[in-house]
From Swiss-Prot:
It comes from Natranaerobius thermophilus (strain ATCC BAA-1301 / DSM 18059 / JW/NM-WN-LF). Belongs to the tetrahydrofolate dehydrogenase/cyclohydrolase family. Gene3D superfamilies: Leucine Dehydrogenase, chain A, domain 1, NAD(P)-binding Rossmann-like Domain. Pathway: One-carbon metabolism; tetrahydrofolate interconversion. Pfam families: THF_DHG_CYH, THF_DHG_CYH_C. It comes from the Bacteria. SUPFAM superfamilies: Aminoacid dehydrogenase-like, N-terminal domain, NAD(P)-binding Rossmann-fold domains. This is Bifunctional protein FolD. PROSITE patterns: THF_DHG_CYH_1 (PS00766), THF_DHG_CYH_2 (PS00767). NADP(+) binds at G165, R166, S167, S190, V231. One of its GO terms (biological process) is methionine biosynthetic process. The lineage of its organism: Bacteria, Bacillati, Bacillota, Clostridia, Natranaerobiales.
Amino acid sequence: MSASLIKGSDVAKEIRSDLQKDVEDLKSQGVTPHLAVVLVGEDSASQTYVNMKEKTAGKVGIESTVKRLPTNVEEDELLRLIDELNKDDSVHGILVQLPLPYHIDEYKILNAIDQYKDVDSFHPVNVGNLTIGQKRFTPCTPAGIMKLLDSIDYDLNGKHAVVLGRSNIVGKPISLLLLERNATVSICHSRTKDLTEMTKSADLLIVAVGRPEIVTGKMIKPGAVVIDVGVNKVDDKLIGDVEFESAKEVAGWITPVPGGVGPMTITMLLNNTIEAARRCLNEQ
């Protein structure tokens, strides 16, 4: 068998078409959604991500501003910038591109962002709201994964979902979203014993560890849905955390890399920015 592809690029395009209409509606009421992105340093991958966010925002009519700071910027200066953006009523969403230089306290920076403008949903209050099912914003990559599952009408009720990776950005929040849909969730990590036994029991396997091709076809249950979150550059080629060629012969559905989860992450960031702008309009 050969797995059917879940093409995030196609799903994202459809969603952005709807987002464009939402932006037009907000503009007709005098509000232009505005995303401010803070980029610290010269990391090439971060610059690429920021450029993609800026370009995609423009396509749906969202205003975007990029604040670029040098690698050696003082933490206090970065905090002052965030405070300015928090107080700027024309800015609806604030995103600090990660990772940050080692001398800057990442938690302190993310905690400084106004929780109502925290479109990445990394603020401790928003993380807490997610755990009790009262989310203001859904973290972008997990939200994108759920949309991909919806695009194939995948019923999570009673399914065994295995999440490989326990990061605050993907692993933990996606597990909570899956629980909300009545999946039985197992989280695996570097200390998990009998990893293959766990992955082979998964009806849904989500891999987000940042290690090239760590999951092979032999580790996948026949017919399973496989969501590959990883993006790794190897020999100038982008590959996922799943060995695609062997996995596609076993899985029922699989996301490609690139063109799978990545486009969805940016699209859901824009969705959160629009939601933040809509909240501001409702409070006027």
